[in-house]
């Protein structure tokens, strides 16, 4: 408590405690004079004052404890976050060069194999393969290039020509009959027309033609019963004539022969 005696809230609490002491002394004097109603009201007010003072002291202690704990917790969080921010550095070209030179020095220090019989020298095949692997590992960083935009590689002249070809009208020459102003436009359109790949159109197989046979139309005539009877009679009479026709023909032939003889 000695550290917090200079705090302004503690000073107010001390003053309130002193005032409460004086208040208690005054109440005891009133009780001696048999003034019970005044004593009861004073006791209730004193109880309220003590409760509020206790609540205020508890709040002060909690706030002071939090203020002390906050500065101690901040450095710990910073210390834990610092190692997370550090990322491992990529190997630089200098490290690759140093490793490459060290491997070359080791390969040069080893003497080549010499055949005493033929006098020929043979290098170490294992060292050659190792050198090739080291070179293949060290080259990618040096040979890496930034991606080049295809738009930047094209010169600006091509864009201008393309724009000109689009703006000029393309007129077919078949429509320029008798128009002298149309003929130069027709030629310019053919020269400046943008070159495009020919479009291949697949021809569809023709559908087989189906010939529809004409349908016979039957006409039905309404016939009365009287007409039906007449047709039946007509059909009956020719049959009789047909049956009697050979005899009749023979009779006619005989009559004709007799006439010729009489003449």
Swiss-Prot record:
Region feature (Disordered): 69-166, 223-263
Comp. bias (Polar residues): 111-121, 151-166, 232-263
Effect caused by changing residue 146 to P: In strain: ATCC 51908
Keywords, comma-separated and alphabetical: Disulfide bond, Glycoprotein, Host cell membrane, Host membrane, Host-virus interaction, Membrane, Secreted, Transmembrane, Transmembrane helix, Viral attachment to host cell, Viral immunoevasion, Virion, Virus entry into host cell
The keyword Chloroplast is annotated on this UniProt entry: no
Residues of this chain annotated as glycosylated in UniProt: 72, 80, 87, 92, 105, 127, 139, 163, 199, 215, 231, 251, 253
Effect of residue 220 to H: In strain: ATCC 51908
Compositionally skewed regions (Low complexity) per UniProt: 72-92, 100-110
InterPro entries: G_prot
All ranges on the Extracellular side of the membrane: 67-263
Identification of the protein by name: Major surface glycoprotein G
Record note on what altering residue 8 to L does: In strain: ATCC 51908
Variant or mutagenesis effect after changing residue 111 to L: In strain: ATCC 51908
UniProt topological domain (Cytoplasmic) ranges: 1-37
Outcome of substituting residue 77 to I: In strain: ATCC 51908
Disulfide partners: 173-186, 176-182
Organism the protein comes from: Bovine respiratory syncytial virus (strain A51908)
A GO CC annotation given for this chain: membrane
Keyword Transmembrane helix among record annotations: yes
Any single biological process term in GO: symbiont entry into host cell
Family: Belongs to the pneumoviruses glycoprotein G family.
Outcome following mutation: residue 45 to T: In strain: ATCC 51908
UniProt-annotated stretches for the region Binding to host heparan sulfate: 187-198
